[in-house]
Amino acid sequence: FNGLEGELPEDVARESIYKTLALKGDKTGPVIGIVPITEHLSEKKLAKISGNKKVQMIPQKDLQKTTGYVHGANNPVGIRQKHNFPIYIDHSAQDAGFLIVSAGEIGRSIRINSQELADFVNAEFADIKE
């Protein structure tokens, strides 16, 4: 299903679907932010929490060579296994108890306990939405 528009399964709320965004910090290099698809990532907040002055989205043409995934398929588990990039999950996922993220292929997603995902990928919960 398309998370942004159209019908969703009855037990799926649009705000429980999260996008995994890859950015580049001016001091740390790549940094990953995970926010609801219905929201926008605050680059300013992510920069501050990750120890950067600024962060910017990694251009799509560089995404696969940086994360190992194409646009729309970034998976936090795979990114953590291949790279040691810092990962930040918006705190709304912690409050909700679970989230749905890409499973590493376009059109495939997994529903997972928020805390278990954070523990597994060594992520930090933070306020990173605009």
Residue ranges and their predicted role:
Residues 1-130:
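Extended, low-hydrophobicity, polar/charged segments
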